[in-house]
Structures are given as C-alpha cells and as structure tokens.
Amino acid sequence: MVTFNCEVCNDTVPKKNTEKHYYRCPNAYYTCIDCSKTFEDGVSYKNHTSCISEDEKYQKALYKGNKKQKQKQQQKQQQKQHQHQPVATPAKKVEKPVIKKAEKVEKTSNGIELHKGKSLYKILKTMKDKGAKKTFLKSLVVDSEGQIRYAKE
C-alpha cells in the first residue's frame, strides 16, 4: 500500500484517503513516504501505484530483487492474452421453452404435505396439533449425504 505525506499539514495519508484529505487541506500536495518522490501538481500521485519496498530502500546495494522482471513477465502475459483472444461474434439467441417440473408432494401418515424446497419452519407453522408436531420432528432423520429425510414408519 502506498502512503503519502501531505506537505502542507505534515499529515500521513494512505492513498485511499487522499481525496478525503483534500476537504481538510485544499492546497495539499503529497510526497511518497517510501521513495520520497514529491507530487506537486496535486493529481499525478494517482498514477503512483507501485513503489520500492522497505528492503530495497534500506538495503540499497545489498538488495537483490526481481521486481522489474516480474512486472515485465506480467506485461508479456497480458499481451499474449490479448493476442490469443478470439473476436467474439454475436450469436443468435435461441429461446427455449421453459418447462416447469411438477413439484413432488409427499404426504405423511399425519396428513402433512411435504413440498421439495419448502422450509421446515413453514411446514411446522401449518400444523396446529402440538402432538403431531412432536411426532413429525421425531420422525426426521439425517441420511448419509447429510440431508434431512422424513422416515416413514
């Protein structure tokens, strides 16, 4: 993450908060904390997306990094992707008739209708008798697939 220092009020501002900082400090211009580059026009800091790392800053000649090579490889891969992408021709849309499947309705011995996809709460809400709810809940079983099934007695 790139962090800037406001040269007007000497406040440390992360890049994501620079626009908000202009409301408090309208004449703000920033200096990157990592690479010490000053952006005096007030807008060019937006293009400053990558910067040197702390290792590179403090180790100077001792630092051996492949940052430039990685960036070049990424650019090459992006160019290859753009070249290999076929030009898409708009295909004609074929409308298929929508066929609704009849819902499976399973009736229990208590006369409770079980619809596939219906929540257990709604099923229990339709039941009036407390004893029927109790026996219904006792007959629910979890199968080997982890699904709740109604065990027929």
From Swiss-Prot:
Residues 65-83 have a biased composition (Basic residues). It is found in: Nucleus, Nucleolus. Its main location: nucleus. SUPFAM superfamilies: beta-beta-alpha zinc fingers (SSF57667). GO terms for biological process: negative regulation of transcription by RNA polymerase II; rRNA processing. Zn(2+) 1 binds at C6, C9, H21, C25. InterPro entries: LYAR (IPR039999), Znf_C2H2_LYAR (IPR014898), Znf_C2H2_sf (IPR036236), Znf_C2H2_type (IPR013087). A zinc finger (C2HC LYAR-type) spans 1-26, 27-52. Residues 63-96 are annotated as: Disordered. One of its GO terms (molecular function) is zinc ion binding. Coiled coil: none annotated. GO terms for cellular component: nucleolus. Keywords: Metal-binding, Nucleus, Repeat, Zinc, Zinc-finger. Zn(2+) 2 binds at C32, C35, H48, C51. Pfam families: zf-LYAR. Present with 3430 molecules/cell in log phase SD medium. Belongs to the UPF0743 family. This is UPF0743 protein YCR087C-A.
